[in-house]
């Protein structure tokens, strides 16, 4: 199963997360299919490739709980659900 989740990078006590599409069986910091954004929890900055994320969500990829919360904060999740409802 493929998921959108966080990959931890950076130094100790100075963590940055990459938002990646990865197989759920792969290790947290292991192989991934595509990088679709990054998140810095210290400065609360979030950069997303919205088109790529919506494309993956349309293919049936499930986000982790934390990624879903970040997508909701940036209004990407609402955009995806509205596109999905308009399609049906």
Swiss-Prot record:
GO terms for molecular function: structural constituent of ribosome. InterPro entries: Ribosomal_bS16, Ribosomal_bS16_CS, Ribosomal_bS16_dom_sf. PROSITE patterns: RIBOSOMAL_S16. It comes from the Bacteria. One of its GO terms (biological process) is translation. SUPFAM superfamilies: Ribosomal protein S16. Pfam families: Ribosomal_S16. Keywords: Ribonucleoprotein, Ribosomal protein. One of its GO terms (cellular component) is cytoplasm. Transmembrane segments: none annotated. Gene3D superfamilies: 3.30.1320.10. Belongs to the bacterial ribosomal protein bS16 family. This is Small ribosomal subunit protein bS16. It comes from Mycoplasmopsis pulmonis (strain UAB CTIP) (Mycoplasma pulmonis). The lineage of its organism: Bacteria, Bacillati, Mycoplasmatota, Mycoplasmoidales, Metamycoplasmataceae.
């Amino acid at each position: 199963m493929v998921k959108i989740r966080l990959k931890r990078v950076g130094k100790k006590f100075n963590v940055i997360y990459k938002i990646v599409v990865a197989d759920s069986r792969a290790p947290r910091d292991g192989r991934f299919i595509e990088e679709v954004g990054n998140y810095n929890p210290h400065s609360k900055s979030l950069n997303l490739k919205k088109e790529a994320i919506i494309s993956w969500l349309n293919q049936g990829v499930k986000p982790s709980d934390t990624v879903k919360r970040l997508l909701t904060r940036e209004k990407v999740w609402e955009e995806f659900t509205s596109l999905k409802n308009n399609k049906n």
